C-alpha cells in the first residue's frame, strides 16, 4: 500500500483513537498542542525504523539488478554501487550461485573472513557485505552476472509505502 502524508496521518489518528471525532459537540482552543505535527514526528520515526529493521515481508521490495552494474574485481570478488534511495539490501543472487548470499555488515566476523583468499566465500555459500552504498560480493567468478538484487527503497518524499501487515507494528502513544 502507498499512502500520502495526509492519508498516513488519517490512519495514525484512527489507530491512536483520535478519530472518529464526535460531531455533536464543538470545542475550540487556540493554546493547544499541534497534534498533527506531533503525530507526523511519530510517523516518521516509526517509518524509518520500519524500513531499516522490520522483516522484509512487511515491506515493498524492489529488484534493482537491472539498474546497477557489477564490477568484477577478480579473485572471487565484485562490487556493486547501490542506488541512492536504497535503504536496505534484502536478497542478492548471482547467476552461478547455488543459493542467495548471506548479507552481513562490514564489521561482522563473516565479513572480516572475506579479506583472506583462503577463508573467502565461494559459490556454494556466497557472502554480500553492505557498506553504505557499496555492496561487496564474494563467491563470484568472471562470468557471474547479478540475477536478483532486492532492496527496500526510500519512497518519494511525502509518501509511505509498505505491506498492510506493517500497520500492526504501530504502538499506542
Regions found by a protein language model. Give the residues of each.
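Glycine-enriched, solvent-exposed interface loops adjoining structured elements
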Residues: 1-126, 130-173
